[in-house]
Amino acid sequence: MSLLTEVETYVLSIVPSGPLKAEIAQRLEDVFAGKNTDLEALMEWLKTRPILSPLTKGILGFVFTLTVPSERGLQRRRFVQNALNGNGDPNNMDRAVKLYKKLKREITFHGAKEVALSYSTGALASCMGLIYNRMGTVTTEVALGLVCATCEQIADSQHRSHRQMVTTTNPLIRHENRMVLTSTTAKAMEQMAGSSEQAAEAMEVASQARQMVQAMRTIGTHPSSSAGLKDDLLENLQAYQKRMGVQMQRFK
């Protein structure tokens, strides 16, 4: 796996699924391929994106700044600086300085990532802030190692929290989660459908599923009533794809 592919993988792992994630993936691909060279416009676009947490925006801004060639004196962006200040905690800053000194001795991406993984997310963000604010310089490869270590830690905690939700025994949370997944699957089907005759059929199925979820939420239904909802919808999607001659693995 190439270095930039690895960076893209780690960075996208902390972006919530949805149309915005697809858009960010496209931007990253363009930047890494050298197709997008307007850092100013890119940062303005990033700043106004909804849904993303300030830290995720800060990390993306840091990656764009590292990889898009720009004039030396280009202004640093406040939204990135604020996100990478380790919540203003002096302990984070102290640890960030120690980490920075260690990173100065590293020359490889993986070496930097290994060193960084033993620090807290706050210290890692502060260290990125040091580099972003030009208070310290490391090679691009080492800086990207730091980015990936930070993303790995964030993705780990997101995964733990997601697993807790998926394995929860609380029937109300499970019920709501199934309805949310059904609704987002239906939305994805509508976006994929296009305009052929079969597409109208897929749209109809998706629309019915969303109406059903709406009705269930309005009336208030028994927590077990949502069991299998998403799977039924995915089976319909699978059948639709087969008729369209598209053979894809299940989304489950």
Swiss-Prot record:
Annotated InterPro entries: Flu_matrix_M1, Flu_matrix_M1_C, Flu_matrix_M1_N, Flu_matrix_M1_N_sub1, Flu_matrix_M1_N_sub2, INFV_M1
SMART domains: Flu_M1_C
Gene3D superfamilies: 1.10.10.180, 1.20.91.10
SUPFAM superfamilies, per database record: Influenza virus matrix protein M1
A single GO BP: viral budding from plasma membrane
Alphabetic keyword roster: Host nucleus, Membrane, RNA-binding, Viral matrix protein, Virion
Positions of the UniProt region annotated as RNP-binding: 165-252
A GO-annotated cellular component: membrane
Region annotated Membrane-binding, chain positions: 1-164
This protein's record includes keyword Cell inner membrane: no
Topology of this chain in the membrane: Peripheral membrane protein
Cellular location(s): Virion membrane; Host nucleus
GO MF terms, alphabetically ordered: RNA binding; structural constituent of virion
Short name of any one Pfam family annotated for the protein: Flu_M1
UniProt motif (Nuclear localization signal) ranges: 101-105
Purpose: Plays critical roles in virus replication, from virus entry and uncoating to assembly and budding of the virus particle. M1 binding to ribonucleocapsids (RNPs) in nucleus seems to inhibit viral transcription. Interaction of viral NEP with M1-RNP is thought to promote nuclear export of the complex, which is targeted to the virion assembly site at the apical plasma membrane in polarized epithelial cells. Interactions with NA and HA may bring M1, a non-raft-associated protein, into lipid rafts. Forms a continuous shell on the inner side of the lipid bilayer in virion, where it binds the RNP. Determines the virion's shape: spherical or filamentous. Clinical isolates of influenza are characterized by the presence of significant proportion of filamentous virions, whereas after multiple passage on eggs or cell culture, virions have only spherical morphology. Filamentous virions are thought to be important to infect neighboring cells, and spherical virions more suited to spread through aerosol between hosts organisms.
Subunit field text: Homodimer and homomultimer. Interacts with NEP. Binds ribonucleocapsid by both interacting with genomic RNA and NP protein. May interact with HA and NA. Cannot bind NP without genomic RNA.
Misc remark: Most abundant protein in virion. When expressed alone can form virus-like particles in transfected cells.
Family to which the UniProt record says this protein belongs: Belongs to the influenza viruses Matrix protein M1 family.
Protein's name according to its UniProt entry: Matrix protein 1
